[in-house]
Regions:
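Phosphate-binding beta-alpha-beta segment of Rossmann-like dinucleotide-binding domains, i.e.
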Residues: 87, 96-149, 316
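Short beta->alpha connector loops at strand-helix junctions that form conserved
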Residues: 31, 72-73, 89-100, 177, ...
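Rossmann-like dinucleotide-binding domain for NAD(H)/NADP(H)
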Residues: 91, 172, 228-317
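Hydrophobic/small residue at the entry helix of a nucleotide-binding pocket
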Residues: 158
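Rossmann-like adenosine-cofactor binding region
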Residues: 54-61, 179-272
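N-terminal glycine-/charge-rich "phosphate-binding" loop or analogous flexible N-terminal tail
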Residues: 1-45, 308
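An anion/phosphate-binding loop that grips the pyrophosphate of nucleotide cofactors and donors
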Residues: 45, 63-66, 200
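NAD(P)-binding Rossmann-fold cofactor-contacting core
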Residues: 168-184
Length: 317
C-alpha cells in the first residue's frame, strides 16, 4: 500500500519518529509540497496525508488509486470533502489532540496582555527598573482576571477546556454554543452572540471556519465591544476581518488582541495586524507543543490502521 505524506515537516520537523508509519506500507514523506507538485508526488498513492496542503476535486479526479485522505489536523477545510465523498474516498482528521496546548496558549495571550508581561520584561532590559526610585516599577494598568467575564465562541473540546481554566481564575464564563442550558455546567452561562460581544471583557474564538463564521468578527461587532475588551483568536484566522480589527485597535474601540492565527499564513508584509496597536501575534504555534504533536502522530497511526482494517474512525462527514 503506497502512503504519501505531502507536508510532514510541520507535524514532525525531526524530533519525532516516522518508523511506525513506514511499517504500515510503502511510505514516502515530503517536508513540503507545492501545489504544482501534488499530482506527481501523489500518483499511485492509496493513502495521502496532508496538514495544510490543499486537495481539490481536480486533484482527486486525477488520482484514481486514492482511497484515503488523512488530515493531520483537526480542521479539514483544506480538503474538498464533498468531492471525496462522491468518489468514495475516506477523509479523516485528528480531533482533540491539541486541546490542552491551545487552551494554554489562550491564557498565555490573556496573561501577557492583562499583566503586560512582554512589555515590562522589555522595559527592565532597557534599565527602567534599575532607574526606579521604588522597589517596583510599572507604568501600564495591570488587570486582575477574577470577576471578569470571559466570552467563549464555540464550546467544543478547546472552548470547554478554556472555560475550566477561566473558572479556576475566578472568571465568569459565558458561551455562545449550540449546546442547550441542560448540557452546560452551572458555571457557564449561555448567551446569544451579540450579547456576548457587548457584555464580555475578554472574548476567545473557538468555532469552526465555515461560510457562516467567516469574518464574523468585524467592524459591526467591534463597535458592540467594551473599549477595555480583549479579543483572543487561536481558532482560524478568517474568523476575524483583519483590517477591521486593526482599525478597532488603532482607534481605541477595543483595548487589545492576542492572535495565533491569521487569514494568510505566513502573513504578507502588509498585513495590517503586524503594526496594529496592542496586537500580540504568535506564529500559529498553539497546537505545536511536543506532547500535542506526539498525540497527533499516534492518532494518525490509529486512523490508518482502522482504515486498513475496514473500520475507519474519525471520519469527516
Amino acid at each position: 500500500m503506497k502512503i504519501v505524506v505531502l507536508d510532514g515537516y510541520a507535524a514532525n520537523p525531526g524530533d519525532l519518529c516516522w518508523d511506525e508509519l513506514h511499517a504500515l506500507g510503502n511510505c514516502t514523506i515530503y517536508e513540503r509540497t507545492a501545489p504544482t507538485e501534488i499530482l506527481e508526488r501523489a500518483a499511485g498513492a492509496e493513502i495521502l496525508l496532508t496538514n495544510k496542503t490543499v486537495l481539490t476535486a481536480e486533484h482527486m479526479a486525477q488520482l484514481p488509486e486514492l482511497k484515503y485522505i488523512g488530515v493531520l489536523a483537526t480542521g479539514y477545510n483544506i480538503v474538498d470533502v464533498e468531492a471525496a465523498k462522491e468518489r468514495g474516498i475516506v477523509v479523516t482528521n485528528i480531533p482533540a489532540y491539541s486541546t490542552d496546548s491551545v487552551a494554554q496558549m489562550v491564557f498565555a495571550h490573556i496573561l501577557n496582555i492583562t499583566q503586560q508581561v512582554q512589555y515590562h520584561s522589555e522595559e527592565v532590559r532597557k534599565g527602567r527598573w534599575t532607574q526606579s526610585k521604588d522597589f517596583c516599577f510599572w507604568d501600564t494598568p495591570l488587570i486582575e482576571l477574577r470577576g471578569k467575564k470571559l466570552g467563549i465562541v464555540g464550546l467544543g473540546h478547546t472552548g470547554y477546556t478554556t472555560a475550566r481554566i477561566a473558572i479556576g481564575f475566578g472568571m465568569k464564563v459565558c458561551a455562545y454554543t449550540s449546546k442547550t442550558n441542560f448540557q452546560l455546567p452551572p458555571e457557564i452561562r449561555k448567551m446569544e452572540l451579540d450579547e456576548l460581544f457587548r457584555e464580555c471583557d475578554i472574548i476567545s474564538l473557538h468555532c469552526p471556519l465555515n461560510d457562516s463564521t467567516r469574518e464574523m468578527v468585524n467592524a459591526e461587532r467591534f463597535r458592540m465591544m467594551k473599549p477595555t475588551a480583549i479579543l483572543i483568536n487561536t481558532g482560524r484566522g478568517p474568523l476575524v476581518h483583519e483590517q477591521d480589527l486593526a482599525n478597532a485597535l488603532n482607534s481605541g474601540i477595543i483595548y487589545a488582541a492576542g492572535v495565533d492565527v491569521l487569514s494568510e499564513e505566513p502573513p504578507r508584509a502588509d498585513n495590517p495586524l503586524l503594526t496594529a496597536k496592542n496586537c500580540y501575534i504568535t506564529p500559529h504555534i498553539a497546537w505545536a507543543s511536543t506532547a500535542a504533536r506526539e498525540r497527533l502522530m499516534q492518532i494518525m497511526l490509529e486512523n490508518i490502521k482502522a482504515y486498513q482494517e475496514g473500520k475507519p474512525v474519525n471520519v469527516v462527514k
